[in-house]
């Protein structure tokens, strides 16, 4: 199997792939969120003291929360890497619930990965292996298990509790599976063609 197999250039639809990736990114963000309801990745009793120092500049001492549940990766990324003063500041409220910048980041993160996946799939079809599960596993490995600890967004990999790995692995797999389902269905419906690596007229 040639993992670097490429599609015929005249069958590629980059603009359409990006458009579908935008849709898939928004929808799959809710899938990823939903996966964290029965399998929460972080606990309010696990502390992340290494990332708690800057909180004294944001909140009064009695309001500081050093738990992993509060100091989650999107929060720390916005605070430490983008310099957002308070990532929990409300973007809007709905039915009395606050939607903050951490939630916005979650959706943007999903859109970026979905667009990237859909565009790459136009050229390298093997990225779709196992209906997107390969891409989900790669995202888990390179983002959550390598990049996040190196960026200080999580504790070192071997300090993470087992339930966080279970939640994130499951979440990434169903996230990319949903992206692939949406990508394939919308692309095939809009173009009235199979994916570019499949010859036209094929029964596949």
Swiss-Prot record:
The chain crosses the membrane at residues 15-35, 101-121, 133-153. Residues 1-14, 122-132 are periplasmic. It is a multi-pass membrane protein. Homodimer. InterPro entries: DUF1440. Keywords: Cell inner membrane, Cell membrane, Membrane, Transmembrane, Transmembrane helix. One of its GO terms (cellular component) is plasma membrane. The keyword Amino-acid biosynthesis does not apply. Its main location: membrane. Residues 36-100, 154-204 are cytoplasmic. It is found in: Cell inner membrane. The keyword Cell inner membrane applies. This is Inner membrane protein YagU. It comes from the Bacteria. GO terms for biological process: response to acidic pH.
